[in-house]
């Protein structure tokens, strides 16, 4: 099993969710996040004063899937989240040793 963590622009969430559903994924976890990468922060005006905003709003998507869906899920996220501009985000993949459904006690792929 693999865990995909994708940090994307918030306005791309619906497109990514739909793309993942088309691949056959049944559930995702979404968390609001703030961060910066190469694009750093940006300046905003508020009541005539300029402020530097260090952290930009992002959305973090977490998915645990079987190894067989990994490449399709990554491709779906990339295609749906890409704008071609700085700050499109990152995708991280890690191994999951075990998954357990709390309600039923199912484990492994049956739990996801």
Language-model features and meaning:
Residues 1-112:
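Positively charged, small/polar-rich N-terminal and surface patches that mediate targeting and assembly
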């Amino acid at each position: 099993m693999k865990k995909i963590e994708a940090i994307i622009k918030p306005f791309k969430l619906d497109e990514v969710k739909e793309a993942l559903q088309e691949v056959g994924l049944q559930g995702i976890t979404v968390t609001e996040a703030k961060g910066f990468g190469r694009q750093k922060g940006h300046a905003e005006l508020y009541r005539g004063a300029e402020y530097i905003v260090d952290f930009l709003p992002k959305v973090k998507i977490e998915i645990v899937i079987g190894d067989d869906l990994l490449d399709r899920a990554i491709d779906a996220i990339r295609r749906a989240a890409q704008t071609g501009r700085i700050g499109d985000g990152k995708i991280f993949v890690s191994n999951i040793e075990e998954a357990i459904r709390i309600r039923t006690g199912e484990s492994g792929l049956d739990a996801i």
